[in-house]
Amino acid sequence: MKGSLIIVSFLILGTLCGFYHLIPYDFTDSKLSYYALCGLMFCVGISIGNDPNTLKSFRSLNPRLMFLPVMTILGTLAGCAVAGIFMSQRTSSDCMAVGAGFGYYSLSSIFITEYKGPELGTIALLSNIMREIIALLGAPFLVKYFGKLAPISVGGATTMDTTLPIITRCSGKEFVIISIFHGFVVDFSVPFLVTFLCSISF
């Protein structure tokens, strides 16, 4: 939660700097966002490489539960595609690109800003932060009315880090491994799906 608020604070600060012309306009035309993206991808790779225990724990998973991240991805993209039908100013592929962030707001918003512009990038940032917040605050409700796998699916890419504690508390310790596996797979899919969906239009 704290990390999400910090990200939003920087967004607001940047908006104010741009609105009052405190930063030269040429600054936004630089390749700074591209280099930031490269740095972020490097950090993602380090985090995966530094945690071999996570990869080993996947072997003990129930084979049927391995389909959960696939269902999360398909369900999210299907819902975004339907939402795009009712949005006259946005294509379904735009909406799907935003949804393909799966709560990974830092990476997806940079990708989308780079490919589609700052407006859609901002929408991606806010919508993916909201997904994380909903998973954090709504986990008890989701478990009560939709089952113990519900907060894992809603958490998207965040279930192996920020939302893991609340999922463990609400769903039980037996769901820790599937939560980590789910977050790992969905997290890994983000750069590929976002890039692909930004490159097409329908």
Where do the model's predicted regions map?
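Alpha-helical membrane segments and immediately flanking helix-loop junctions
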Residues: 93-133, 148-181
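Juxtamembrane boundary at the C-terminal end of a transmembrane helix
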Residues: 192-202
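Juxtamembrane helix-boundary/capping and inter-helix hinge elements in multi-pass membrane proteins
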Residues: 1, 22, 48-55, 61-65, ...
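Entry/N-cap segments of selected transmembrane alpha helices
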Residues: 52-80, 121-133, 178-186
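Hydrophobic transmembrane alpha-helices of multi-pass small-molecule transporters
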Residues: 38, 135-136, 163, 191
